[in-house]
Amino acid sequence: IPSKKDFLLTQSIFPTVEMRAVKWRTKDSGRFVNVAKYRAFNASVPFATREAWQTSREGALPPLGQKLLVSEQEQILLEDSHGSDQDRLIDLLYDDVERHVEAIRSRLELACGDVLADGKFELLQENGLTLEVDWNVPVENRPTARIPWSDPTSDPIADEQRWIRQLDDIGAPAPELVITSAKAYSYLAENNAYRAAYYGSVSPSTTPTAMLNPQQINVVRGNYSLPPITFYKAQVRVDGKSRRVLPEDLWILVPPDREKWAQTMYGVTAEGLVLSRGTNPEIIREDAPGLIITRGVQDDPVQIWTKGAAVGMPVMHTPDAHIVAKVL
């Protein structure tokens, strides 16, 4: 079952990985090497020092999922049609599979947006579960534009260059792309700095007042070696109400080699383990990680239910390799 096209976070920003485990784990290690020193002839070679570090964190991957019922009344109505609607029951169960998959992927997409927006994975009394994992994103990686970009006198070019220099100063790779909303992007068309850069103006009085089109904005960005922009507009339904996965006021600089930066981790569910030990139905043990759909029956009241289950969450390995800037 394919993911929704708008779900970029779990598809390509936080690449999905399935593990035969129930814990997430991150490691950070490295070393510093000082330069060697010159010496006079016949003088002793100086001793150097070894500087290295390794830190690790781990925690349990939380379970998530849902059930859908085929009620007692629905079963009676299907039976009342003398079995001619048996295919409808089968179709209903298969439709449930798609609903479960979309619901779980939607929740993980929302979780990835939560981690991107504030650097934390948080659950607050969600089905009775409260949880917080702080990935310790440095405050320097969560800047605010000096002047909101909705103000034509702001300077988005200088802001973005400053944020890219911040990444370069700490040795992080140059960002590969920008994720933002169409709303945040729209203000670039009327921005004085962008128009002056496109027309080569040295004075505001000589800058044409026409709005820039997307091609002209891209010319400016190319001239300043700024990364390409990808629009993000995904919404999910939470308790019957639509919710944006990411706020519209964010400008996110995303690094390359993203599997080293952050991932959407799926672990092994109890349902997957049961099926891997069973005979009818049965799955091989290598297929146990990931999203599992099962069916069950209860006799009082008589109900058939389908269940979607997963164990997973977004995990950030390198919390200082990206920028999440508030620009509006």
Question: Where would I find each of the regions flagged by the language model?
Answer:
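Short alpha-helical segments and helix-capping/turn motifs at coil-helix boundaries
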Residues: D6-T10, Q161-R165, G290-I292
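A general structural signal for short secondary-structure junctions and capping/turn motifs
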Residues: I13-T16, L167-A172, R295-Q298, P314-V315
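Long, contiguous amphipathic alpha-helices that act as assembly "spine/axial" helices in icosahedral shell
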Residues: L61-E140, D155, D159-A184, V302-G308
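Assembly/oligomerization interface modules of large self-assembling protein complexes
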Residues: S12-D80
